[in-house]
Regions:
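Bacterial N-terminal signal peptides that target proteins for export
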Residues: 1-6
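Pocket-lining segment of extracytoplasmic ligand-binding domains
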Residues: 80-83, 89-90, 113, 149-243
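Ligand-binding clefts/hinges and TM-proximal coupling segments of bilobed small-molecule sensing domains
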Residues: 131-142, 211-280
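N-terminal signal peptide c-region/cleavage motif recognized by signal peptidases
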Residues: 13-15
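An extracytoplasmic/periplasmic, membrane-proximal ligand-sensing/linker region
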Residues: 160, 167-168, 177-180, 184-193, ...
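Bilobed "Venus flytrap"/periplasmic-binding protein-like clamshell domains
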Residues: 21-47, 51-52, 103-163, 167-169, ...
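Short beta-strand-centered segments that line the small-molecule binding cleft or hinge
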Residues: 73-75, 93-101
């Protein structure tokens, strides 16, 4: 039976009205968060018709945290140490929707560069990231802990980093994670990675309890044939605790069911799983109640 036009229009309208639009704060163009946010939103939107995730460029983690706390965005991507610090504050209103990926911090130099270690960069101009980025915080933690004074270059947007290295205005660019756009661009042009030594990793971890040993797998970037050891921490998709339990449940379910789709869109998103969320959360109560409900139903945590 064919429905009258007005009936079809009514059902279409009610379906649209029922769909919840969620704003996801990412970071400045050219960095890893906007790329991840695009893949994440596409996967969720394709999987869950009741939700529509829309990305918004921000200054990065340092802006996403206060925006989330104030309820001005629904979801926010927050990196490593900043996420750990925000979640550890007494009475924090922030909750975890999902773990994103672990981000090993690295420097990249030109292939013909004489620099072979972090200490070699002493006194040299080094791009550490953008003003609001969690990657920048990690870079500062590494050079400051190791007592390596560098000429710290802060960018307006992450995409400005590679040209500074290629032109010789910077000796190195700091970044983190698998599939980071600036690393990909520079590695294709013969860039070479520099990470902390075993002794340096030990020193960094002793001074920065929010960090952990993290490995950059072999072949994560062009020309990177061996795995590299470094330090880093998990990044998360966070929300406010006042975020709808129904919507967080739907998000968790969509993330779980679209796991292979998300991994196919972005290599580092292979780590975006509900199982990793359980493992990476500092405490179970920091996971949003709606997500916990789905985790119980999926058998990922005990009831």
């Amino acid at each position: 039976m064919r429905l009258p036009f007005f009936a079809v229009s009514f059902f279409s309208m009610t379906s649209t009205l029922a769909q919840q639009t969620l704003v996801l704060g990412t970071a400045t163009p050219g960095g890893g968060f906007p790329v991840y946010g695009a893949a994440f939103s596409e996967a969720i939107n394709a999987q869950q018709p009741k939700l529509r995730v829309e990305t918004r460029n921000t200054k990065g983690s340092t802006e996403n945290v206060p925006l989330l706390e104030a309820g001005r965005i629904d979801l926010g991507l927050v990196a490593g140490e900043l996420a750990s610090a925000a979640l550890s504050k007494p009475g924090t209103p922030l909750r975890i929707v999902t773990a994103m990926y672990a981000s090993p911090g690295m420097f990249i130099v030109k292939g013909d560069s004489p620099y072979r270690s972090i200490s070699d960069l002493e006194g040299r101009p080094v791009v550490l990231g953008t003003q609001g980025s969690g990657i920048t915080v990690l870079g500062h933690a590494i050079v400051d802990t190791l007592g390596v004074p560098v000429g710290k270059i802060t960018l307006e947007k992450a995409a400005d980093g590679p040209p500074l290295l290629e032109s010789g205005k910077a000796a190195a660019v700091f970044g983190a994670g698998v599939g980071w756009p600036a690393f990909t661009a520079l590695a294709k042009n013969g860039g070479r990675f520099i990470g902390p030594s075993a002794a340096e990793i030990k020193a960094i971890l002793a001074r920065n309890p929010g960090l952990q040993p993290v490995t950059l797998p072999a072949n994560s970037y062009p020309g990177q044939g061996a795995a590299l050891q470094s330090v880093g921490s998990w990044s998360y998709v966070l929300c406010n605790k006042s975020f709808s339990e129904e919507n967080s449940y739907l998000l968790a379910k969509a993330i779980h069911l679209s796991q292979s789709t998300l991994a196919g869109k972005l290599e580092q998103a292979r780590e975006t799983t509900m199982a990793n969320t359980v493992a990476a959360a500092p405490r179970p109560d920091l996971i949003h109640p709606g997500v916990l409900k789905y985790l119980r139903e999926a058998g990922l945590i005990s009831r």
